[in-house]
Regions:
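Conserved ATP-binding subdomain of kinase catalytic cores across diverse folds
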Residues: 36-183
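Regulatory N- and C-terminal appendages and interdomain linkers associated
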Residues: 1-45, 55-63, 162
């Protein structure tokens, strides 16, 4: 399925398609309008993140808002992200890995990547009621412990099994990855 590569490329038809295919719309329910705001301004180097607010044709069973992540439009940053397979890894995580995890993860409505252009899009549940850690100031010890409590089971489940479980996921210590990183 084709997908928008920037917030300006979003449209009602595409949003209706992904929400319908994810089982998020009731019979006859359609997105009739939407607006978006950039929520990555000043914090995102490798991506553009927007919050979409949705309007429906009737009382909605679908989400009131979504978070949509796009590859950055800065050529140098996009090259770095693609060299490190960051977009690919995130798409693989949401399409393949997340489904088998027993940890809290935002619902993913759609995730795809175009390898030719290096573009990607990931549409996620909007966790607006939560707050982000401060990238400059850091987080509290309590917040750090909460992260470890959630991430530890993920690491335990796949420790030493990554290559056999996800053969298409390139490791950052692989010869190919190191060679591409040095030569880019």
């Amino acid at each position: 399925m084709s997908f928008p590569v920037s917030p300006e490329g979003l449209n009602k038809e595409w949003l209706n398609k992904i929400l319908d295919e994810s089982g998020s719309l009731s019979d006859g329910e359609k997105v009739t309008n939407f607006s978006f705001e950039n929520i990555s301004e000043g914090v995102g180097l490798l991506g553009i993140v927007v919050r979409i607010r949705l309007t429906y044709n009737k009382p909605a069973s679908g989400p009131a808002s979504l978070v949509v992540k796009f590859a950055t439009d800065e050529p140098e940053n996009r090259e770095l992200a693609n060299t490190m397979n960051l977009y690919e890894r995130e798409v693989i995580f949401f399409n393949e890995i997340a489904k088998g995890l027993d940890i809290p993860i935002p619902k993913c409505y759609f995730a795809a990547m175009d390898f030719d252009s290096g573009s990607d899009v990931i549409v996620l549940e909007d966790l607006f009621e939560y707050s982000l850690g401060d990238q400059i100031g850091g987080i509290t010890a309590r917040q750090a412990f909460m992260v470890v409590d959630v991430v530890a089971p993920l690491h335990a489940k796949y420790w030493g099994k990554g290559e056999e479980t996800f053969p298409d996921m390139q490791r950052i210590d692989s010869d190919d990855f190191i060679e591409r990183s040095v030569n880019s």
